[in-house]
Curated annotation (Swiss-Prot):
Pathway: Quinol/quinone metabolism; menaquinone biosynthesis; menaquinol from 1,4-dihydroxy-2-naphthoate: step 2/2; Cofactor biosynthesis; ubiquinone biosynthesis. SUPFAM superfamilies: S-adenosyl-L-methionine-dependent methyltransferases. InterPro entries: SAM-dependent_MTases_sf, UbiE/COQ5_MeTrFase, UbiE/COQ5_MeTrFase_CS. PROSITE patterns: SAM_MT_UBIE (PS51608), UBIE_1 (PS01183), UBIE_2 (PS01184). Gene3D superfamilies: Vaccinia Virus protein VP39. S-adenosyl-L-methionine binds at T74, D95, N123, A124, S140. The lineage of its organism: Bacteria, Pseudomonadati, Pseudomonadota, Gammaproteobacteria, Enterobacterales. GO terms for biological process: aerobic respiration; menaquinone biosynthetic process; methylation. Disulfide bonds: none annotated. It comes from the Bacteria. This is Ubiquinone/menaquinone biosynthesis C-methyltransferase UbiE. Keywords: Menaquinone biosynthesis, Methyltransferase, S-adenosyl-L-methionine, Transferase, Ubiquinone biosynthesis. Belongs to the class I-like SAM-binding methyltransferase superfamily. MenG/UbiE family. Methyltransferase required for the conversion of demethylmenaquinol (DMKH2) to menaquinol (MKH2) and the conversion of 2-polyprenyl-6-methoxy-1,4-benzoquinol (DDMQH2) to 2-polyprenyl-3-methyl-6-methoxy-1,4-benzoquinol (DMQH2).
Length: 251
């Protein structure tokens, strides 16, 4: 019998016990929740809004459908999906982190997004929904923080309806070498300083940079999605591969 307490994974560049990672990631997001939106704009120079807009455009979401915005954080995608599905549809904003979920709920209610949105604290590895529930699932800048990504992908596949699609928007591997070097310099030297100045938390943004480097590259993630059961999997490199959008279907 395997002693699960001895199984390890990565937390950034650190090797930690699998059972510890979720709590460590939770600490990061409890720490940054109040400055999350501000830091997203600063870190990406606002480009994250274009990446999310492209994800919305690729989602195929229509009026009356049911959408899961997983690791939905402060609700950027949920706000858009709420308008797209209308009164006859539903969006579930799910996040494992209570602080992020609270920020998302407050933000969306303040801008009038109510009525067709539900909020659920959920672990991506064991989604608390029946089989074949959602027409579309998105996970935006969240998969790299999941301890067992393969398990999470299988869980997402289970709760998708036949004909449904999963979209994974995540930091990836730059495809242009000079950009890769500049990106490394920015990530490891400038990003933690911004985190220190704005959020008073350099360590969390150092973890961000490290977690990006440990995340599977474009083709590896595509293969992982296929192994989980998804078909017709493809991906789009955005900003020369700094970010990639993967899309797969359940048939």
């Amino acid at each position: 019998m395997v002693d699960k307490s001895q199984e390890t994974t990565h937390f950034g560049f650190q090797t930690v016990a699998k059972e510890q990672k979720a709590d460590m990631v939770a600490h990061v997001f409890h720490s940054v929740a109040s400055k999350y939106d501000v830091m997203n704009d600063l870190m990406s120079f606002g480009i994250h809004r274009l990446w999310k807009r492209f994800t919305i455009d690729c989602s195929g979401v229509r009026r009356g459908q049911t959408v899961l915005d997983l690791a939905g954080g402060t609700g950027d995608l949920t706000a858009k999906f709420s308008r797209m599905v209308g009164e006859t549809g539903k969006v579930v904003l799910a996040d494992i982190n209570e602080s992020m979920l609270k920020m998302g709920r407050e933000k969306l209610r303040n801008i009038g997004v109510i009525g067709n949105v539900e909020y659920v604290q959920a672990n991506a590895e064991a989604l608390p929904f029946p089989d074949n529930t959602f027409d579309c699932i998105t996970i935006s800048f969240g998969l790299r923080n999941v301890t067992e990504k393969e398990k999470a992908l299988r869980s997402m596949y289970r709760v998708l309806k036949p004909g449904g699609r999963l979209l994974v928007l995540e930091f990836s591997k730059p495809i242009i070498e000079p950009l890769s070097k500049a990106y490394d310099a920015y990530s490891f030297h400038i990003l933690p300083r911004i985190g220190s100045l704005v959020a008073n938390d350099a360590d969390s943004y150092r973890y961000l940079a490290e977690s990006i480097r440990m995340h599977p590259d474009q083709d590896t993630l595509k293969a992982m999605m296929e192994d989980a059961g998804f078909e017709s999997v493809d991906y789009y490199n955005l900003t020369a591969g700094v970010v990639a959008l993967h899309r797969g279907y359940k048939f």
